[in-house]
A protein has these predicted regions:
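Noncatalytic, solvent-exposed loop/strand surfaces
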Residues: 1-207
Length: 207
């Protein structure tokens, strides 16, 4: 992502799979700053970072969807989100969490504790609507029960504060993780279809 550092000097901004964001001077390739944006140990970044108005908007997802395929993994405590950073220095401006913190919800077939709500990853690049001062993002499924009303949904956030303005859920009760591929212990009861809204939201004017 091409951004500016506040002095009209360009920056190249990118993220790695461990949820660290880097800003690099494109002329010298020197790292201007580095920011740790992990919400959890399993946080990752799969979409590009959006830039608008001197700020960066980072989509947070989680590879716990795959880790849950291991029956020894205690499922599931992570969730997705959006984090806003100051492009000048990487300072965190606000963060939006896709679910509340997970709490114990019972046990799996093997007697291990299960936690929820979880999931609702932001897999793709957030869409900026400058005219309305909004950010739009698509969300993934829940990884464990209880299901939330913003999984498999489009969410609209205020660009300045990160507050949720509205949401539209396309598919309700989609609770799924990789344990469902082989009937593993972490597969939720009444598992959903693993639908997600995996692509970026398209902002267009309809005549």
């Amino acid at each position: 992502t091409l951004a500016k550092n506040g002095a009209d000097k360009p920056l190249l901004v990118f993220a790695d799979s461990m949820a660290f964001v880097y800003a690099v001077d494109p002329a010298t390739l020197e790292v201007s700053w580095k920011a740790d944006v992990r919400l959890f140990e399993t946080s990752t970044i799969t979409g590009s970072i959006s830039y608008h108005g001197g700020n960066l908007f980072v989509p947070i997802s989680s590879y716990e969807v795959a880790a849950a395929g291991n029956p020894q993994h205690i499922c599931c405590t992570s969730h997705g989100g959006i984090i806003a950073l100051d492009a000048k220095n990487g300072d965190r401006l606000w963060e939006w969490h896709a679910t509340e913190d997970a709490t114990e919800q019972g046990v799996d077939r093997d007697g291990n504790p299960m936690f929820g709500p979880s999931g609702v990853s932001i897999w793709s690049t957030p869409t900026i609507d400058a005219a309305r001062n909004r950010l739009y993002a698509g969300t993934g499924e829940n990884l464990s029960h209880p299901a939330t009303d913003n999984s498999d949904a489009v969410v609209a956030l205020d660009l300045d504060t990160g507050e949720l303005v509205w949401q539209f859920q396309a598919t309700a009760d989609d609770v799924w993780n990789a344990a469902c591929l082989n009937g593993g212990a972490n597969c939720p009861e009444n598992a959903g279809g693993d639908f997600d809204i995996g692509a970026s939201v398209i902002h267009a004017k309809l005549d």
